[in-house]
Amino acid sequence: MCGIAGQISADPNKIAANYPAYCRMQKSLARRGPDQRGIYLHGHAALIHARLAVVDLENGCQPMVLDQGGEKYILVYNGELYNTPELHAQLAALGHRFVSHSDTEVLLHAFAQWGPDCLEKLN
């Protein structure tokens, strides 16, 4: 099971100042996800992920970022989508372009396309 941590702060200076703490958090999650680790800092948020790779070992790195239509979407995720191929096909037909075969990327594109309503489409 992957490890996920993070912080949201009203003061963006606290996010930047806490970077050493995020590195320690990430290190403490290493046993949860030995395959890849990542930290994403932006404005008022910090996202930390330690990945236990199951699908797409090379390209499913997290936190995963998607820039689409002038919007930026960032996701840390632990789980498994059982209908990844179907959702991938639907999203590709709508013009989404993928760089991996990970369910994380499919989930990220699904949210970009349908917003919170994407949850109704997940299996």
Question: What positions do the PLM features span?
Answer:
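N-terminus-centric sequence/structural signature that marks the extreme N-terminus
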Residues: 1-123
